[in-house]
From Swiss-Prot:
Pfam family, one: AAA_lid_NAV1
Cellular compartment(s): Cytoplasm, Cell cortex; Cell projection, Dendritic spine
Alphabetized GO MF terms: protein phosphatase 2A binding
Lineage of the organism: Eukaryota, Metazoa, Chordata, Craniata, Vertebrata
Residues modified to Phosphoserine: 1513
Organism: Muntiacus reevesi (Reeves' muntjac)
ANK-type repeats, residues: 702-732, 736-765, 769-798, 802-831, 835-864, 904-934
Keyword Repeat part of the UniProt annotation: yes
Cysteines engaged in disulfide bonds, as pairs: none
Encoding gene (name): CTTNBP2
Bias (Polar residues) ranges: 385-394, 576-586, 1552-1563, 1571-1588
Major subcellular site: cytoplasm
GO cellular component assignments: actin cytoskeleton; cell cortex; dendritic spine; FAR/SIN/STRIPAK complex
Name of the molecule in the record: Cortactin-binding protein 2
Ranges annotated as biased composition (Pro residues): 497-506
Length: 1642
C-alpha cells in the first residue's frame, strides 16, 4: 500500500501521554488485554489490521476529494474568457506561502488528528503484544518446572513410603532380638551365678592347697637346712681327719728322712771331711740344681719361694729342676723375708729358690697392674708376695698385682710352678727322698695366719676368704707338730726329689718362737678349688712354642714408689687385694727400678743375702744400684700378653734373707759355682770386693748356668761380669737347648741381648724344638729384641721343627710390632707349617685383625731391611696404615696365599667364618682373589661352617649396596614453617645379590620402610638390630609401607610386587641405578603421609585435624610460637583442596597475614572479594573457598571477628550480616556452605575479651607438653641423625646422640622453667630447635648454634615476658615501664636469664667443662653473678607504716681472695609517712655516687638515686618467689655454676609475701632491723633484728629480689659481733628524726 510507510511510523512525541492514559481508558472500559487468550489476541490483531486498512482507504479517498475541492474552489469560478480572473490567479500563485491562507483547513486538520490517533493506537498495541508474548514464554517455563517438581515429589513420596516400610520391618526385628537377648541375659546371669559359686569353691580348695604347700615347703626347708648342717659337719670332720692323716704321714716320713740323713752324716764324719762341724752337711752335687747353705744355732731354717702359674696347662711339663736353695740362719730381730712369686708361692721345707727358671703359661705374661709403694721402712715386697712377717700364699692371677696386700690367709688352687715346662737345664730333684716329705713340709710350713715370728711377736691378719677347715681348729696342736717336723726336715741341705710343690701351699715358714706368718690370697678367676691335701696336678703336655713361650722363672712385682702407703688396696681382675701393715722389720730391701736409693736400706751390719732376680720379659732389675733394663711397650691381645708390656713392670725374685752366711762353705747347685758371686750379683751386698775375695778362686764349671740365669733375669751387671771372664762358653745350651741369648730374647731384656750379640753370641742357634732367639722374641712380642736380632742378621725365615717361622709366631700371638719389623725386613709370608698353616692362618685363628691387615697390606721397603729408629711411632704408623687399608690400597699378598688350604682343606676364610671372626672375614673378603666357594676335604665351603653373622657377610659378599631414600616431594617455599624440613632422607642401604628375586626385593623395601618408621618413632637410641619390628603394624606416627605413592629405581618407576624381565641385580647394573627413591603420598593425592614424615606429626592427629576442618568449617590452631601452626594449616588446606578438586569442585586457597593494622573492613573486603560472603539474594556458587588467617594473635579477636561469629557458626541465609559498602549503601551477606576458615594463633592461651570468641570456633591446642609437639622434636632430630649416619642408628653413648638429647632437654627444661615462672607468652614451640646441627664429632657447632638461638630468640622473649609480668600490676607513676625498666627489674631479668641458662641450657651439655667455659661467654646473661644482688630486709617492729628500704650504693671490696661488693640494706622508717605509701628504694644523701659502675661493666648491681623500685607488685613478688624456688629446688640441676665461684652462691630468701603495713608508730627511736651480708668466704650472712618485734607484731619479711643466703640458725648477738667485725658490712642505727634521710614520694 502507498500509505504503509506513513501509517506505520509511530509518533513518539505523544507516546508517553497515551501510554499513561491507556491504563485509565482501559480501566473505564473494563477491558483488560492481559486477560485475553492467545486466540483472542490473534482475533484482536486481525480486526485492528483490517481497521487500519480501511482507514488507509478512507484517507486516500479523502485526499482525492480534497484535491478536487481545492481545484474547484480555486479555479472553479474562473474561465478563460475572463482575463481579470487569470491575473488574479497568477497573483495568488506568485505570493509566498506564509502570506497565503488556506482556502479550506477544517477537513485536513481533522484528518491529521485522526491519523495521529491511529499511529498512537498502533504503537500501543505493538507494545502490549510484545509484553503478552514474554508473559506467555514465562508461563510455559513455569509450567515445565512445576511438572518436574511434581515428578520429583512423587519419587520422594514413594521413597519415603519404602523407607517407612523398611524401618517398620527393622523395628520389628529389633523388638524380636531384644526379647531374645533379654532371655539370653537371664540365662547367662544364672550361669554366672553357678560359675561364681564354683569359683568360690575352687578358691577355698586352692587356699587350702597353698597352706599345705607352704607347710610342706617349710618342712622341706628345715630338712634341707638340717642336711646342709650335717653335710657341713661331715665335711669338717673329713677335712680334720684327712689333715690328721697327712700330718701323721708327713711326720713319719720326716723321721725316716732324718734317720737316713743322720746315717749319712755319721758316714761323712768318719771319712774325715774338712768341713766345719754343724755348718755344712754333705750333699750330692752331681744332680743338684740348688745352692744350699747350712746354718746352725737354732736349727737350719730356710725359706723357699717359687711361682705359681695360671690354670693354663698347655705348655707345662713335669718337674725338671728345683730352684736355688739357700738355708739361712735366723737371727733375733732379723726375720726372714719370704719372696712371693706371681700366683701361689709354693716352697719346700729346706729350700729357698732364688733362681727359679721355668716356663709359665699365657696367664703369666699378662701384667697390667700399677706399682704401689710402701713406706721407706718397708722391707722387700714382691709382686704377689708378702713382706716381712707374712709369707706368700697367693693364688695365680692372670694379672700381676703388687704385693701391697693384707696378710689374708687364703688357699686357692693353682698348678705348681715346677710342674710346668722349664726350658732351662736343671738337674732333677734328689731321687732318694720320699715324695711325701714334700707334702708334709707344705702341710706344716706357714699354714697358720697367726703363728709367732722370730721375735716372738704376732702379726695380726684378717680372716682369709678361702680357708680350709684345717686352719680353723687345733692351732696349738698344729703348731707343735709343725715345729717338730720342720726342725727335723730343715737340717737337710737338699730338697726332696720327685715331689713338686702342691698347689695352694704356702712357702716355708719359720718355726719355734718365730712370729706368725701371714698369708695373702689373690683369687684366681675361674680357678677351681683344690684341697690342701690333694696331690699335685697331672703334668701337662710336651713343651713347644705353639703357644706363647713363657719365661723360665717366677714373676714378682717391684714396688716402685716408696712414698705411698702400703695400706692401699689394689684392684686386679675384679678381685680386691688389701695391703699389709707397714711394720716391716729390718734386714730386707725394696727394689726400685730406677734408683735403689729410693728404697729402704738394711739397718744391720753387712750380712750378705742371696737374691737372684729372675725378671720376666724386660722388667727392670736393680743390680748393685747400677743396672737398669727398660721395659718396652708392646700390645699383645688376650692371654698372650707380652711380659714386657708397658702396663706390667714385674720382677720375679726369690729372696733368702739370712743373718749369717759363710760363703767358704757354701756349695752351688752346680759343682764349682760361686755363692759369693751370686750374693754379689743379687745387688744386696753392701761390700762387693770382700765378698768376691772371701770364697777364694772358684772354677768356671757352673758359670754357663749362671750366665743363663743372669740373661733370663736381665741382670746386666752380672751378665757383663760373666762375659768379661775368659773361657766362658756364651753359646752354651741347657738341656732344652736354650742358650743365654735365647733366654734374654724370650724375656725381652734388650740390654742383655745387645751385650750377648756384641760378644758374638750365635744369633741363629736353635733349641731342641728348633726355635731360635728371634722366634722366642717374636712370639713374646719383644719388638726391640726382634729389631736387634734382625740387625745382627738373624734368619728371619727360619722354620722350627713344626715349620713355625718368627712371622708365624708373631701372628699367632698378635704381636703387630714384631710383624711389622719382620715384614719390613723382607720375611716370606708364604712359609707353611707342618700342618699347612701360613701366617695368615695364624692371624685369623686368633682373630687379630691388625695382624691380618699388616700381612695383607704392609709393603716391604724397596731397600730391604730398614729398622725404625723410633718404636713409639709404631702405633701411629699402624693407624695410618689401617686407614690406608680402608681406602684405595691394594693387598700385596697373592690370591693363592689367601686361598691356601691346610692339611684338612681349610682356608683362612674357613677359620674366620667358623670362629665368628667377622672383622677378619671382612678383611679377607676385600681381597679380590678370595674364593669363598672353595671346599675342604669334607666338601664344605666357608659358608657351610660359618656362624650366623659370618654367613650374612658371605651372602652379601658380591651384593650391590643401593641407598634407599624417602622423598616427600617438593616443599613449597614460603613462611609455612617448613624451612628446616628436608625433601629426601636416606634410611638404609639395600643389599641386592645375584639370587635376589623381585619378591625378595619388594619385601626388603617394605621391611626397610617399616623398620625405619618404627626406629625414628621409638623412644630410645636403639639400633635396628636391637629392635624387633612387626612388618604389618604401623609405627607410632602412623606410617607404613602402604603410605608409599611410588618407587623409582634410579629413573625407572617401579611399584611393589612388579617384576621385570631382568633380575634386580642385573636391572640395577644395566640401568646404573644409584639409588631407590620412595615417594610418599602427599596432599596432591589427598593424603597426609608426606606431611607426617616431613613434620613428624602423627598421621592420626593430622587426619583428625582435617576431619575437624571438613566438619566444622571454622578451626583455629593455637599454641606457643614455633608450634608449626601455619605449616599445619597450609598442608591441611592443600589436602582439602585436592580432595575437593578430585570430587569435581573447583577450589581456591586464600591466605592472609593479620597484623596490628589489619582492620575489620579489610577482612570484610577479603571475604567479599573471594566470594566467601555473598549477598542474601544471590545463590552460592559451586566453588570451594579455603581462607587461612595467620598471626591472629597480633589483633584482637573480639574486634576482628566479633561481627562474624553468628554467620560463621551458621553457613546459611538464616544468619545474615549487614555491611556497608564504600559508597555508603549497606547490604546483607551470609557465609555459604562452601567456605572454610582456618586461623593460627601463636599464643599459648587466650585472655580477656578474646575468650568470648572461643565458643564460636573449633580450637586445636598445640601444647608443648602434649602430643604432637611433645615428641615432634625428638622424632625430627632422631630422623636427622639417622639420615646423617646413612640410615644407621648410632649407639646411645655416641657424642651425636648425647648432643641431640641435650638439645631436646634444653627445649623441655626451658619451657618447664618458663611455665613455673608464669610466663606462658615466652614458651617456645619446637620449630626453633629443628635447625639443630647434627655434625658427628663437632659438638661445639651445636653449642654455638644454641648460643645464637639463645641470644636471638630465647633471651629477648624471656626478658620481655618477665618485664611485662613484673610491671603488669604496677601503679601508674610509681613503676617503670618495660621500655625503661628500673635497675631492680633489670636485676630480676638478669637473674632469671642466668638461672634459666644454667638450669635449662648449660646443664647436661656434652662438652667438657673447660670447653663449655669457653662458650659460656657467648650466651647473653651467662656471666651474671647471683651474689651481687639486693635483698629485702625485714620490717622493724612498730615501724610498719610507710617503711623505707635503704640500699647502700657504694660497693666495698673484700679483704679476702675474692673482691666482690656486698650490700648493707637497713630498713628505714619515717614518722609522718602516709599509710598508703608504697615501699620504695631510697638512697642515702651521703652515699658516694662517683664510684658507681653499670651492671654491664663490673657485673655488680648498683641502684641509682633516680631509679626506685616499687615493691608493691604482687606479680613481681610471685616472680621472685618462683625464681627462689627454682634456685632452691632439689629436683632441678645444681646452679652453683652461676656465680664466679662456689663461695659466691647466694640462696634465695625464703621469706613470706609482702607485709601489710600499719600506720601506727609506737617507738620511733627503735633501731632498724637490717640484713648484713658477710664476706663471701664465710658462707653465711648475718642477720640482726629484734626477734621480739617479730614475735609480737608477726611482721613477715619482705621477699628478696635475688638469691642471698642466710644462716639457718644464727643468733642475734653472734650476728652482731660478726657484722661489727666484718670489713665489708655495716650496722647503722638510724633515727626516724634524722635529718640526713629525706624520704620522698614520687
Amino acid at each position: 500500500m502507498a500509505t504503509d510507510g506513513a501509517s506505520c511510523e509511530p509518533d513518539f512525541s505523544r507516546a508517553p501521554e497515551d501510554a499513561a492514559g491507556a491504563p485509565a481508558e482501559a480501566a473505564k472500559k473494563e477491558f483488560d488485554v492481559d486477560t485475553l487468550s492467545k486466540s483472542e489476541l490473534r482475533m484482536l490483531l486481525s480486526v485492528m489490521e483490517g481497521e487500519l486498512e480501511a482507514r488507509d482507504l478512507v484517507i486516500e479517498a479523502l485526499r482525492a476529494r480534497r484535491k478536487e475541492v481545492f481545484i474547484q474552489e480555486r479555479y472553479g469560478r474562473f474561465n478563460l474568457n475572463d482575463p481579470f480572473l487569470a491575473l488574479q490567479r497568477d497573483y495568488e500563485a506568485g505570493a509566498s506561502d506564509k502570506e497565503k491562507k488556506p482556502v479550506c483547513t477544517n477537513p485536513l486538520s481533522i484528518l491529521e488528528a485522526v491519523m495521529a490517533h491511529c499511529r498512537k493506537m498502533q504503537e500501543r498495541m505493538s507494545t502490549q503484544l510484545a509484553a503478552a508474548e514474554s508473559r506467555q514464554k514465562k508461563l510455559e517455563m513455569e509450567k515445565l518446572q512445576l511438572q518436574a517438581l511434581e515428578q520429583e515429589h512423587k519419587k520422594l513420596a514413594a521413597r519415603l513410603e519404602e523407607e517407612r516400610g523398611k524401618n517398620k520391618h527393622v523395628v520389628l526385628m529389633l523388638v524380636k532380638e531384644c526379647k531374645q537377648l533379654s532371655g539370653k541375659v537371664l540365662e547367662e546371669a544364672q550361669k554366672l551365678e553357678e560359675v561364681m559359686a564354683k569359683l568360690e569353691e575352687e578358691k577355698k580348695k586352692t587356699s587350702a592347697l597353698e597352706e599345705e604347700l607352704a607347710t610342706e615347703k617349710r618342712r622341706s626347708t628345715e630338712m634341707e637346712a638340717q642336711m646342709e648342717k650335717q653335710l657341713s659337719e661331715f665335711d669338717t670332720e673329713r677335712e680334720q681327719l684327712r689333715a690328721k692323716l697327712h700330718r701323721e704321714e708327713a711326720h713319719t716320713a720326716d723321721l725316716k728322712e732324718e734317720i737316713d740323713k743322720m746315717k749319712k752324716m755319721i758316714e761323712q764324719l768318719k771319712r774325715g771331711t774338712d768341713s766345719k762341724p754343724g755348718l755344712s752337711l754333705p750333699r750330692k752335687t752331681k744332680d743338684r740344681r740348688s745352692i744350699s747353705i747350712s746354718v746352725a744355732t737354732e736349727g737350719p731354717m730356710t725359706r723357699s719361694v717359687a711361682c705359681q702359674t695360671d690354670l693354663v696347662m698347655e705348655s707345662a711339663e713335669p718337674v725338671k729342676k728345683l730352684p736355688l736353695t739357700v738355708p739361712v740362719k735366723p737371727a733375733a730381730g732379723s726375720p726372714p723375708v719370704a719372696a712371693g712369686a706371681k700366683g701361689n708361692a709354693c716352697a719346700s721345707a729346706a729350700a729357698v729358690r732364688p733362681g727359679v727358671e721355668r716356663q709359665v703359661s699365657h696367664g703369666d705374661l699378662i701384667g697390667a697392674s700399677l706399682p704401689a709403694a710402701p713406706p721407706p721402712s718397708a722391707n722387700r715386697i714382691e709382686e704377689n708376695g708378702p713382706s716381712t712377717g707374712s709369707t706368700a700364699d697367693l693364688t695365680s692371677s692372670p694379672t700381676p698385682v703388687p704385693s701391697t696386700v693384707s696378710p689374708a690367709s687364703g688357699h686357692t688352687p693353682a698348678p705348681p710352678p715346677h710342674s710346668l715346662h722349664s726350658p732351662c737345664a736343671n738337674a732333677p730333684l734328689h731321687p732318694g727322698l720320699n715324695p711325701r716329705i714334700q707334702a708334709a713340709r707344705f702341710r706344716f710350713q706357714g699354714s697358720n695366719a697367726n703363728d709367732p715370728d722370730q721375735n716372738g711377736n704376732t702379726t695380726q691378719s684378717p680372716p682369709s676368704r678361702d680357708v680350709s677347715p684345717t686352719s680353723r681348729d687345733n692351732l696349738v696342736a698344729k703348731q707343735l707338730a709343725r715345729n717338730t717336723v720342720t726342725q727335723a726336715l730343715s737340717r737337710f741341705t737338699s730338697p726332696p726329689a720327685g715331689a713338686p710343690p702342691r698347689p695352694g701351699a704356702p712357702p716355708t715358714g719359720d718355726v719355734g718362737t718365730y712370729p706368725p706368718v701371714g698369708r695373702t690370697s689373690l683369687k684366681t678367676p675361674g680357678g677351681a678349688r683344690v684341697d690342701r691335701g690333694n696331690p699335685p696336678p697331672i703334668p701337662p703336655k710336651k713343651p713347644g712354642l705353639s703357644q706363647t713361650p713363657s719365661p723360665p722363672h717366677p714373676q714378682l712385682k717391684v714396688i716402685m714408689d716408696s712414698s705411698r702407703a702400703s695400706s692401699t688396696g689394689i684392684k686386679a681382675d675384679n678381685k680386691t687385694v688389701a695391703s699389709p701393715p707397714s711394720t716391716l722389720p729390718q734386714g730386707s730391701r725394696v727394689m726400685n727400678e730406677e734408683n735403689l736409693s729410693k728404697s729402704s736400706s738394711p739397718q744391720l751390719p753387712p750380712k750378705p743375702s742371696i737374691d737372684l732376680t729372675v725378671a720376666p720379659a724386660g722388667c727392670a732389675v736393680s743390680a748393685l744400684a747400677t743396672s737398669q733394663v727398660g721395659a718396652w711397650p708392646a700390645e699383645t691381645p688376650g692371654l698372650n700378653q707380652s711380659a714386657c708390656s708397658e702396663r706390667s713392670l714385674v720382677i720375679p725374685t726369690t729372696t733368702a734373707s739370712s743373718s749369717s752366711i759363710h760363703p767358704v762353705n757354701a756349695s752351688s747347685r752346680r759343682a764349682g759355682a760361686s755363692d759369693s758371686l751370686l750374693v754379689t750379683a743379687s745387688g744386696w751386698s753392701p761390700s762387693l770386693t770382700p765378698l768376691l775375695m772371701s770364697g777364694g778362686p772358684a772354677p768356671l764349671a757352673g758359670r754357663p748356668t749362671l750366665l743363663q740365669q743372669a740373661a733370663a733375669q736381665g741382670n746386666v751387671t752380672l751378665l757383663s761380669m760373666l762375659l768379661n771372664e775368659e773361657g766362658l762358653d756364651i753359646n752354651y745350651s741347657c738341656e732344652d737347648g736354650h742358650s743365654a741369648l735365647y733366654s734374654a730374647a724370650k724375656n725381652g731384656h734388650t740390654d742383655c741381648v745387645r751385650l750377648l750379640l756384641n760378644a758374638e753370641a750365635q744369633v741363629n742357634v736353635a733349641d731342641t724344638n728348633g726355635f731360635t732367639p728371634l722366634c722366642a722374641a717374636a712370639a713374646q712380642g719383644h719388638f726391640k729384641c726382634v729389631e736387634l736380632l734382625i740387625a745382627y742378621d738373624a734368619n728371619i725365615n727360619h722354620a722350627a721343627d713344626g715349620g713355625q717361622t718368627p712371622l708365624y709366631l708373631a701372628c699367632k700371638n698378635g704381636n703387630k710390632e714384631c710383624i711389622k719389623l719382620l715384614l719390613e725386613a723382607g720375611t716370606d709370608r708364604s712359609v707353611k707349617t707342618r700342618d699347612g698353616w701360613t701366617p695368615i692362618h695364624a692371624a685369623v685363628d686368633t682373630g687379630n685383625v691388625d695382624s691380618l691387615k699388616l700381612l695383607m697390606y704392609h709393603r716391604a721397603p724397596a731397600h730391604g731391611n730398614k729398622l725404625r729408629e723410633e718404636p713409639g711411632l709404631a702405633i701411629f704408623d699402624l693407624d695410618q696404615e689401617e686407614e690406608r687399608h680402608e681406602g684405595t690400597s691394594k693387598p700385596v699378598v697373592p690370591a693363592d696365599l689367601i686361598n691356601h688350604a691346610d692339611s684338612e682343606g681349610w682356608t683362612a676364610a674357613h677359620i674366620a667364618a667358623s670362629k665368628g671372626f667377622k672383622n677378619c672375614l671382612e678383611v679377607l673378603c676385600r681381597h679380590g682373589g678370595l674364593e669363598p666357594e672353595r671346599r675342604d676335604k669334607c666338601n664344605r665351603t666357608a659358608h657351610d661352617v660359618a656362624t650366623d653373622d659370618c654367613k650374612h657377610l658371605l651372602e652379601n659378599l658380591n651384593a650391590l649396596k643401593i641407598p634407599l631414600r624417602i622423598s616427600v616431594g617438593e616443599i613449597e617455599p614460603g613462611n609455612y614453617g617448613a624451612d628446616d624440613f628436608e625433601c629426601e632422607n636416606t634410611i638404609c642401604a639395600l643389599n641386592i645379590r645375584k639370587q635376589t628375586s623381585w619378591d625378595d626385593f619388594s619385601k626388603a623395601v617394605s621391611q626397610a620402610l617399616t623398620n625405619h618408621f618404627q626406629a625414628i618413632s621409638s623412644d630410645g637410641w636403639w639400633s635396628l638390630e636391637d629392635m624387633t619390628f612387626n612388618s604389618t603394624t604401623d609405627s607410632s606416627i602412623g606410617l607404613s609401607a602402604s603410605s608409599v605413592r611410588s618407587i623409582t629405581l634410579g629413573t625407572v618407576p617401579w611399584s611393589a610386587g612388579q617384576s621385570f624381565a631382568q633380575s634386580p641385580w642385573d636391572f640395577v647394573r644395566t640401568n646404573k641405578a644409584e639409588q631407590v627413591t620412595v615417594l610418599l603420598s602427599g596432599p596432591q593425592e589427598g593424603c597426609l603421609s608426606s606431611v607426617t614424615y616431613a613434620s613428624m606429626i602423627p598421621l592420626q592427629m593430622l587426619q583428625n585435624y582435617l576431619r575437624l576442618v571438613e566438619q566444622y568449617h571454622n578451626v583455629i590452631f593455637h599454641g606457643p610460637e614455633g608450634s608449626l601452626q601455619d605449616y599445619i594449616a597450609h598442608q591441611l588446606a592443600l589436602c582439602l583442596k585436592h580432595r575437593q578438586m578430585a570430587a569435581g569442585f573447583p577450589c581456591e586457597i586464600v591466605r592472609a597475614e593479620v597484623d596490628a593494622d589489619f582492620s575489620k573492613e579489610q577482612l570484610v573486603d577479603l571475604f567479599i572479594s573471594n566470594a566467601c560472603l555473598i549477598p542474601v539474594k544471590q545463590s552460592p556458587a559451586n566453588k570451594k573457598i579455603i581462607v587461612i588467617l595467620e598471626n591472629l594473635e597480633k589483633s584482637s579477636l573480639s574486634e576482628l571477628l566479633g561481627d562474624f561469629l553468628g554467620p560463621l557458626e551458621n553457613h546459611s541465609t538464616e544468619s545474615p550480616c549487614t555491611f556497608q559498602k564504600g559508597n555508603g549503601t549497606s547490604e546483607c551477606y551470609y557465609f555459604h556452605e562452601n567456605c572454610f576458615l582456618m586461623g593460627t594463633i601463636a599464643k599459648a592461651c587466650l585472655q580477656g575479651s578474646d575468650l568470648l570468641v572461643q565458643q564460636h570456633f573449633r580450637w586445636v591446642q598445640l601444647r608443648w607438653d602434649g602430643e604432637p609437639m611433645q615428641g615432634l622434636l625428638r622424632r625430627f632430630l632422631r630422623r636427622k641423625v639417622v639420615n646423617k649416619f646413612r640410615g644407621q642408628v648410632p649407639s646411645p653413648c655416641d657424642p651425636v646422640c648425647k648432643t641431640v638429647d641435650w638439645a631436646l632437654a634444653v627445649w623441655r627444661q626451658l619451657n618447664s622453667c618458663l611455665a613455673r615462672l608464669g610466663t606462658p607468652e615466652a614458651l617456645l614451640g619446637p620449630k626453633y630447635f629443628l635447625s639443630c646441627p647434627v655434625i658427628p664429632g663437632h659438638a661445639q657447632a651445636t653449642v654455638k648454634w644454641m648460643s645464637k638461638l639463645w641470644n636471638a630468640v630465647i633471651a629477648p622473649r624471656v626478658q620481655e615476658a618477665i618485664l611485662s609480668r613484673a610491671s603488669v600490676k604496677r601503679q601508674p607513676g610509681l613503676g617503670q615501664t618495660t621500655k625503661n625498666p628500673s635497675q631492680g627489674q633489670q636485676a630480676v631479668v638478669r637473674a632469671a636469664l642466668s638461672i634459666l641458662l644454667n638450669k635449662a641450657v648449660l646443664h647436661g651439655c656434652p662438652l667438657q667443662r673447660a670447653e663449655l667455659d669457653q662458650h659460656t661467654a657467648d650466651f647473653k646473661g651467662g656471666s651474671f653473678p647471683l651474689s651481687i644482688v639486693s635483698s629485702y630486709g625485714s620490717c622493724n617492729k612498730k615501724k610498719e607504716s610507710g617503711a623505707w628500704r635503704k640500699v647502700s650504693t657504694s660497693p666495698r671490696k673484700k679483704s679476702g681472695r675474692f673482691s666482690s661488693p656486698t650490700w648493707n640494706k637497713p630498713d628505714l622508717s619515717e614518722e609522718g609517712i602516709k599509710s598508703n605509701t608504697i615501699l620504695q628504694l631510697n638512697c642515702n644523701r651521703n652515699a658516694s655516687l662517683s664510684n658507681q659502675k653499670s651492671l654491664e661493666n663490673d657485673l655488680s648491681l648498683t641502684l641509682d638515686l633516680d631509679q626506685r623500685l616499687s615493691l608493691g607488685s604482687d606479680d613481681e613478688a610471685d616472680l621472685v618467689k618462683e625464681l627462689q624456688s627454682m634456685c632452691a629446688s632439689k629436683s632441678e640441676s645444681d646452679i652453683s655454676k652461676i656465680a664466679d665461684s662456689r663461695d659466691d652462691l647466694r640462696r634465695f630468701d625464703s621469706s613470706g609475701n609482702n607485709p601489710v603495713f600499719s600506720a601506727t608508730v609506737n617507738n620511733p627511736r627503735m633501731p632498724v632491723s637490717q640484713k648484713e651480708v658477710s664476706p663471701l668466704s664465710s658462707h653465711q650472712t648475718t642477720e640482726c633484728s629484734n626477734s621480739k618485734s617479730k614475735t609480737e607484731l608477726g611482721v613477715s619479711r619482705v621477699k628478696s629480689f635475688l638469691p642471698v643466703p642466710r644462716s639457718k640458725a644464727t643468733q642475734c648477738s653472734q650476728n652482731t659481733k660478726r657484722s661489727s667485725s666484718s670489713s665489708n658490712t655495716r650496722q647503722i642505727e638510724i633515727n626516724n628524726n634524722s635529718r640526713d634521710l629525706e624520704p620522698t614520694q614520687k
